[in-house]
A protein has these predicted regions:
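Dinucleotide-binding Rossmann-like beta1-alpha1 core, especially the glycine-rich loop
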Residues: 57-138, 142, 305
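Helical element adjacent to the flavin cofactor pocket in flavoenzyme catalytic cores
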Residues: 154-204, 208-212
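Short hydrophobic core segments
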Residues: 17-19, 208-220, 361
Length: 402
């Protein structure tokens, strides 16, 4: 049985118990504590999760996809909050989170990609978003390392970046300074009493009581034992492999902004950090819980990145990682109360977890203090997914620790 080895079996109480200590769980806990709520977080390794793999693009405009326009308003609202959010978090934690207002350049490498990018530009304009169409020559003038074959691109000055690892570390520190209590253990099962969520039982046997419970366990959110079937979040893991390279001083500046493209139908992006790190990603694989870094995944990312920026083959490869994105059926998050009183969800953010961190924290804090979601978050309430019929004999799940 997995446990931290330092918990007791006595019941401990709080106003809010957050299950999951990734960036979504941490921002929820931080905001709740700022509102005066006694808050606790359960996670064996708080600050970990998908943020340790993510690139940190804040791409409300360039992440717009057909069929996902519902998500646009939430993405734009969160992106607009990022400058103030970053400043507040850095002041609260004393740590730099690597927020850079550097912009993004999305480019096309052939005529088909160019036509697709033109369609995306038209969709952005119809949606009231700011983006500028550039010729291939104009793209290379902005980023000289781009391949000569670039046929055109979209310049989006409002899509920025943040370092997710620094973001997670800063949120952890801010939570600790705000008085959030951490239980570094696995949750064995949800606690339910008198028809409402009442806390959790940890792997070490500790019973945690809480007036409200927030399930923010990322891709594991649907695996928590004790969840009634009608409130199990429809969240699945989507594997993503990511590479990190280092730009030696002799090659700097390699890129000045995030560069992204679609190569042979696969999305690839290159995110330059101020410290010389270059993040290349990401695969999108329906592989269940597998987090193996594969030769094929590394090859595909380097091959596509090389077509975009040929000079990348000269850079040292310093890290290969794979993580799991928590995806919902419509690729949008689940935010808000469930059919089980006292249980709320903050999960299913898929590829937008870093971008949606500010608005998620604000929305969950408002829910926890007033009982109501703000208008911007209401379209993402869990009730939009009707639960599947279940036999009466299997009304409570028996699953793995979350």
């Amino acid at each position: 049985m997995r446990s931290s080895g330092n918990t007791s079996v006595s019941a401990q109480g709080s106003d809010v118990l957050v299950i999951g200590g990734g960036i979504i769980g941490l921002v929820t806990a931080w905001r709740a504590a700022q509102h005066g709520l006694r808050t606790a977080v359960v996670d064996p390794e708080p600050g970990g999760g998908a943020a340790q793999v993510a690139a940190g693009m804040l791409a409300a405009v360039t992440e717009l996809h057909y069929g996902e326009q519902m998500l646009l308003g939430l993405n734009v609202a969160s992106a607009a909050r990022y400058p103030a959010f970053a400043a507040e978090l850095e002041a609260a934690s004393g740590q730099d989170i690597g927020f850079r207002a550097c912009g993004t350049l999305a480019v096309a490498l052939d005529s088909d990609d160019r036509a697709h990018l033109r369609e995306l530009h038209a969709l952005q304009q119809r949606s009231g978003l700011e983006s500028e169409w550039l010729t291939g020559r104009e793209c290379r003038r902005l980023e000289p390392m781009l391949a000569p074959g670039v046929r055109g691109g979209l310049r989006v000055d409002g899509d920025h970046q943040v370092d997710p690892r620094r973001l997670a570390a800063a949120l952890l520190t801010a939570c600790e300074r705000a008085g959030v209590v951490f239980h570094r253990d696995w949750v064995e099962r949800l606690g339910v009493a008198r028809g409402r969520a009442a806390g959790a039982v940890l792997a070490a046997g500790t019973v945690l009581a809480a007036d409200q419970v927030v399930l923010a366990a990322g891709s594991r959110s649907g695996r928590l034992a004790g969840l009634p079937d009608e409130v199990v979040p429809p969240v699945r893991p989507v594997k993503g492999q990511v590479l990190r390279l280092t730009v030696p001083a002799a090659y700097a500046p390699f890129l000045t902004r995030t560069v992204r493209a679609v190569v042979r139908g696969s999305h690839v992006y290159l995110v330059p950090r101020e410290n010389g790190e270059l993040v290349v990603g990401a695969t999108s694989e329906e592989m269940g819980w597998d987090t193996t870094v594969t030769a094929g995944g590394v090859y595909e990312l380097l091959r596509d990145a090389h077509e975009l920026v040929p000079g990348i083959t000269e850079l040292p490869l310093t890290e290969t990682r794979a993580g799991l994105r928590p995806a919902s059926p419509d690729n949008a998050p689940l935010l808000g109360p469930t059919a089980l009183p006292g249980l709320h969800l903050a999960t299913g953010h898929h590829r937008n977890g870093v971008l949606l961190t500010p608005v998620t924290g604000d929305a969950m804090a408002e829910l926890l203090t007033t009982g109501e979601l703000p208008a911007v978050a209401r379209p993402f309430a869990p009730g939009r997914f009707a639960p599947a019929p279940v036999p009466p004999s299997s009304s409570v799940r028996q699953e793995q620790p979350a």
